[in-house]
Amino acid sequence: MTRLEQLKQHLQDVFGNSITRLQECRNEVTIECQAPCLLEVANLLRDHKLLKFEQLIDLCGVDYADYGEGSWSGLRYATVYHFLSVSLNQRLRLRVFAPDDDFPVLPTVVDIWPVANWFERESFDLFGIMYEGHPDLRRLLTDYGFVGHPFRKDFPMIGNVEMRYDPERQRVVYQPVTIDPRNNVPRVIREEGFHHG
């Protein structure tokens, strides 16, 4: 039995029906769970003697609108957690979808892995995913007056406001975007169009 097969077996033994999906792809294991089970699953991932994922390496938000060929019919927003077990030398990815696309909320894991604090703030700022119970959920990368969440797929590519220096006021001012919207479809050079010679 390989290490990945052993990890998958341990995950199935420990979680049973608490995980809704277990997948191996490119020598990496990904599991999914429902949002109400997140804290239970997270605590077991960290504390169970067969798992020992004591390190949260990264956490990121994902917007699955128009995922793949546009045929995605699942929930829109997810948080993806990347874990490392230093003592067992294994890695794991956990994906949890927020149950409400209009107001995505997941429980915070800051009490389990304190490093999640700024990761969750970044995910909130860029995707608008709320983390219930977070000690200080406020914007991290965008300005305090910023409108919207720039990594959402429905956010306008040119933004909503632009800032410029106003020499009369001697400060930076915000104004509505003056750039005309345009179709930003990438141009593809097909292989048959290359000149080989």
Swiss-Prot record:
Catalyses which reaction(s): a quinone + NADH + 5 H(+)(in) = a quinol + NAD(+) + 4 H(+)(out)
A GO CC term assigned to this protein in UniProt: plasma membrane
Topological type in the membrane: Peripheral membrane protein
Pfam families found in the cross-reference section: Complex1_30kDa
Location relative to the cell: Cell inner membrane
UniProtKB keywords: Cell inner membrane, Cell membrane, Membrane, NAD, Quinone, Translocase, Transport, Ubiquinone
UniProt-listed InterPro entries: NADH_DH_suC, NADH_quin_OxRdtase_su_C/D-like, NADH_UbQ_OxRdtase_30kDa_su, NADH_UbQ_OxRdtase_CS
Keyword Protein biosynthesis assigned: no
The protein's assembly and partners: NDH-1 is composed of 14 different subunits. Subunits NuoB, C, D, E, F, and G constitute the peripheral sector of the complex.
Protein name per the record: NADH-quinone oxidoreductase subunit C
Species, as recorded: Methylobacillus flagellatus (strain ATCC 51484 / DSM 6875 / VKM B-1610 / KT)
